[in-house]
Structures are given as C-alpha cells and as structure tokens.
Amino acid sequence: PKSGPSGKNLKAMETITYVGENLFIGNLGHFFVVLSFVAALLSGIFYVKASAEKGTDATLGRIFYIIHALAVLGIFVTLFVIIQQHYFEYAYAYEHSSKTLALRYMISCFWEGQEGSFLLWMVWNALLGIILIFTAKRWERGVLAIMALAQVVLTAMLLGVNILDIYTLGSSPFELLREKMQAPIFSAPNYLENLVDGTGLNPLLQNYWMVIHPPTLFLGFALTIVPFAFAVTSLFQKEYRAWIKPALPWALAGGMVLGAGIIMGGFWAYESLSFGGYWAWDPVENASLVPWLLLISGIHLMLIKKVTNGSTIAAYTLVISTFIMVLYASFLTRSGVLGDTSVHAFTDLGLAGQLMQFVVLFIWLPIIAVTDGARKRWYM
C-alpha cells in the first residue's frame, strides 16, 4: 500500500509555499479524469435507458461517450506531457522516467506503472467504443452500455479520491511526489532544485519490446470486451443466434492481436535472461494465455453456431469467460497477490478491492441477463 505524509506533516506542508511546481498540468489531468468518469457514467445511464424504453433515442448516450473518449485522450496527453517535460514534482514522472531516456523509452514509461497501464487500456476501449457507435447498428445501445460500464470502473481506478479519510478510490497518476512520500526534502520550499533527475525506467524494461508489447497486449485485452458485450446484449434481447455475425470479426481480431502480444512477450522474455526463456510458466504469463485459449475455442464454437445453430451454451460460455478471465488476470497481476511469485506482477496500490469488484460485476452481468425478471426490466 502506498504511504503518504502523516497528518502533522501534511499540515506543515500545507503552510509552505513551494517554488517551481507546475500545478496547472496536474489539476488539468485530474479534471480530465473526473470528466471521463462522469461522462462514461452518464453515457451508460442513457444507453441503458434507450435499451429499456423502446423508441427512446440514444443520442445522449453517444454524446457522453464521445465526451468520455475525448477526456481519456486528454488524460493521456496530459500525463505524457508531465513525463516528457520532466515534471518531477509528480510522483509518476519521478518514479518512472529520467532525463537521459530516449524518446521511445520515455513513451514506455507511460505504461510501466499501474496507473499508466490502466489508462492505456482505457484508451483502447474508448477507441473501440467510438468505432462501435458507427458500426454496431441495432446492437449499439446494449453493447455501448456495457462498454461504458467497463470504462466507469477503469476510470475509477485513476480517481485517487479520498472518501471521509476512510477509503481511497483509485490511484491518481497526477499525485504530487510530496503528497505520496515522507521525506525531509519536502520541508524546503525550493525542494525541486534538489530533484536533479527521476529514478528512470527499470533497465530490464529499456528494450524495444517494451515499446510495442504492452500496447499490443492491452489492445488484445480491450478487444475481448466487444464479443462479450454482443453476447450479453443478445441474452438481454433473447436473440441467441443473431449476435454471432457482428461479434465474430471482433473475436477474430482479438484472437490475432492477443496472440501477437503473447508471442511478443515470449521473444522479449527470451532476450531478457532473467525472465527465463520464451515461456517460464510464470503465473502472469499463464494469466494472459488462458483468455487467449478460451477465445480461440470460442471462435470455433461461434463458427459452429453460425453454420449449424448448435453449441449455443458452449459458445456463450467461452466468449463470456474470455473477458472475465482477462479481468481476473488483471486482478492477479495488479493486486499484489503474486508479488512474491512473478517477475511480471505489479506492487499493490491498494486497488485489490476495486479489481475484485470489477471481476464480480462482470460475472454478475451475464447472470442477470439470463434471468427472466431482468430481461423484462430492460426490454419491456
């Protein structure tokens, strides 16, 4: 869990007028986080309303999703500016970057930390959602409602909002270094003059695979929500065959991209001897492989369903399980439970509870979809 200043030290820090801090960029970034959260929430609400009430227009759902996507882009740009401009007053820039890094590794710094990798996932989801607004046609309302729900949960991971001094919701990438750690250096108003450089990117991660492997893998993860959303929407609408045609291209794309990301990880592991060769059966490696195996199996059953109208339950089970296993893999990687057993695991930022809620929520959703009462609430 992250440590912060004690109450006494925090009060002392509040009385100090610090010199040279660029607070505007961080406040702007946090504004974009809040805006993206609220816009995704409103988009989801209006899409659910449009799904539940026949004849209701989905325009407001679309507008708020587009606002959400633009806000996510704003977060991305703001955080990259903080890293690229070496604003070491921000913990994320100080902990993950340095002035000596080449541009390609400075880009890699973006997703070295948990907050940045969540944001990368959000960017891909936002882009996929925009594409679906224009291509999903009659499936748009249900599919985008589910996409918006996922974005609400992911954005909450970045809020960093303290609730009644009891619980902190998310971990903000725009947290100031002096707010995150206790150190005598922060008693000086001009402490920034002594922060000559950041700690830099882990030497093992200064590799060209770090530039292309995480974005590819996260695009693969993001793509798995699309067939999931079509499947769950079809359960709500009781259209057990029609969803296959629009969902299949997305499933194929997800299988190819996620497979490519896993292969890239294998080559990277082979080049970095500390990772144990192409494949070490590391828990995190396995956690990315299982969704891919489920997805490939699901694609085969979707093809059978499309041609013969058979294997209905199996096709649903595998497609839905694929995305749920992606969420479970994220929980294993980021909750700290594998911190002592995997070289790939992140340290715990206190997000284990939120990550588990993410998993449970999307397990609950298809269960509700197959309940007669829930279908009536949505579509009658």
Specify the residue positions occupied by each region the protein language model found:
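Polytopic transmembrane helical bundles with strong interfacial aromatic enrichment
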Residues: 14-380
